[in-house]
Amino acid sequence: MDHDKVTISNLHRQVMFTSDDVGKYKVNILKKKIYKINKKSKVKTYRVKAEYKNLGKILKQYDVIVDGTDNFKAKFLLNKFSLKYKKKLIIGAISKFEGHIFTFDFNLKKSPCLKCFYQGEPAEGVLDCETDGILGSTAVITGSLQANEVLKAILNVGKNLNSHILIIDLLNLKFRKVLFRKRKGCICENI
C-alpha cells in the first residue's frame, strides 16, 4: 500500500528502486520486481494513502501487518486497526543512524501497543525522513531485521520482540532490546 511515486530522494534508502523508476508509482514497480524474483508470487497492491477511511477495509484481510511508512500518523493508524482486528503488527522506524523495531501480537492480552511506548503521537516532523535525513544502511539493516520479525510471525518460530523495542544505534554499533508494558489508560488496556 502506497500512493506515492519514486523520487530521487528515495533512492539512497529504498533499495528496490533505481533512477529508471523515478516518477513511477512505487507499488507498481515493487509488484513487477517481486514477480521477477518469483513468478509464482501472489501480490496485491493498493495505490492509496494509508488513511482512516481505507485502512479498516484493507487490513481486515491480512494476518500480519507490516509498517514501512515514513510518518507517525500512519503508524498510529496501523496500530489502531491492528489492535481492533487483533492482528500481528511489525513496525519499523528510522532516523539518521538509528532504527526502531516493534512487534505487537494483539491476540495476546499482555501485548502493549505503539501508544504505550510513545504515550501519544509525537509532534509533526519527529523522525521525518525529509528533515532528519536517513542513512541508507540504517534503512537496509532496520528493514532486514523487520523482515526477519515478519518471517518469525508468519512461521510462528523463534522468539519475537513482543513487548520490546529493538533500538539499533549504527553510529556506535549498539543494539538494545528494551522491555515496555501496557500503559494504564491506553487504547490497548482492555484487549
Enumerate the language-model features and the residues they cover.
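Adenine nucleotide-associated cytosolic modules
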Residues: M1-I191
